[in-house]
């Protein structure tokens, strides 16, 4: 049994598009590579064949993973997200208590939608886990691989 995942509509559509490309494009390309490698004869020492089979295995595993995620996904409507506490899909403005005048903003999302370059962090990350359920004014102390982080929650909102 799979864990339910929570996605935005955009996140769901991105995963669906990736699945479509894997099934209708990548899978066919890999089968063509396998057929081409087979045409070269002896498969026992055929690195091209082995590489194509490995790519096929990875492609099929990703297809199965995406099908599972999409079948268990719950699409969240940002308009229905409360901002009294930090929840998935809320954005938080944090004051770094270790660096003067540093304010950081994160949006908490599922692991599938996390993108630190865009300020989207997973609710399963150390920072995400520490923020869930907190309210404005709470001070949060987080242990991460690089040490300790200390923040104060300044604002909770939905983008």
UniProtKB/Swiss-Prot annotation:
Keywords in alphabetical order: Coiled coil, DNA-binding, Transcription, Transcription regulation
GO molecular function: DNA binding; RNA polymerase binding
Biological role stated in the UniProt entry: Necessary for efficient RNA polymerase transcription elongation past template-encoded arresting sites. The arresting sites in DNA have the property of trapping a certain fraction of elongating RNA polymerases that pass through, resulting in locked ternary complexes. Cleavage of the nascent transcript by cleavage factors such as GreA or GreB allows the resumption of elongation from the new 3'terminus. GreA releases sequences of 2 to 3 nucleotides.
SUPFAM superfamilies: FKBP-like (SSF54534), GreA transcript cleavage protein, N-terminal domain (SSF46557)
Keyword Signal: no
Keyword Protein biosynthesis: no
Protein name in UniProt: Transcription elongation factor GreA
Gene label: greA
Coiled-coil ranges per UniProt: 44-75
BP GO annotations: DNA-templated transcription elongation; regulation of DNA-templated transcription elongation
Family statement: Belongs to the GreA/GreB family.
Disulfide bonds: none
Pfam families: GreA_GreB (PF01272), GreA_GreB_N (PF03449)
């Amino acid at each position: 049994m799979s864990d339910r995942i929570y996605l935005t509509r955009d996140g769901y559509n991105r995963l669906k598009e990736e699945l479509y490309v894997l099934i209708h494009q990548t899978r066919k390309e890999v089968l063509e590579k396998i057929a081409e490698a087979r045409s070269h004869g002896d498969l026992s020492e055929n690195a091209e064949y082995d590489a194509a089979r490995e790519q096929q295995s990875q492609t099929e595993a990703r297809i199965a993973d995406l099908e599972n995620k999409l079948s268990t996904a719950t699409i969240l409507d940002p308009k229905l997200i409360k901002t009294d506490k930090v929840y998935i899909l809320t954005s938080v403005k944090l004051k770094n208590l270790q660096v003067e005048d540093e304010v950081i903003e994160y949006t908490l999302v599922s692991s599938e939608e996390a993108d630190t370059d865009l300020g989207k962090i997973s609710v399963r990350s150390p920072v995400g886990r520490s923020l869930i359920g907190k309210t404005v004014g709470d001070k949060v102390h987080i242990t991460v691989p690089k040490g300790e982080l200390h923040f104060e929650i300044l604002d909770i909102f939905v983008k």
